[in-house]
Amino acid sequence: MLILWSISISMDKSLKMLQILQLCDSNFPIGSFNHSYGMETYLRNNVIDDAKSFSKWVDLFLKHQFITSDGLAIRMLYEALENGDVDKVWEIDNLLIAQTVAKETRNAAKLVASRMIKIYLDLYEIENLKIYAKKIASKEVYGHPAIVFGL
């Protein structure tokens, strides 16, 4: 019986890992491939005009948007949920949108978040995600992919 229980735990972990990998797959249909997150504006204004300036833009975008923003937000979200402070999650949503300077990036984040919510709720029963969707619909929060992913 112990062997069967061990196999069950291993399969459960494998299934959870497969689910995470699916959600993180670049081909997952959340629409993020449709958004340049402000890069088109930089191209139009000749801020990005060669491989070097593009590389610099990617480096800055990753360091300032994804690592120090989205990654930190997810960590803060986990801490808030561990402490039972769901209201803190909604504050984090507002902070993420407020600190996103480029309008294109803010709009893209909202669109990707709404698509993520729809697909995730089609696949999983996540009560906090349902609450988040209602708050977005009632314009209490904006909607951000980092919050969706964290929830």
Model-derived features: where do they sit?
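Glycine/small-residue-rich interface belts in oligomeric ring/scaffold proteins
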Residues: 19-86
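Membrane-interface "cap" regions at the ends of multi-pass membrane proteins
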Residues: 11-18
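Internal, conserved structured core segments that host functional sites
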Residues: 71-72, 76, 85-151
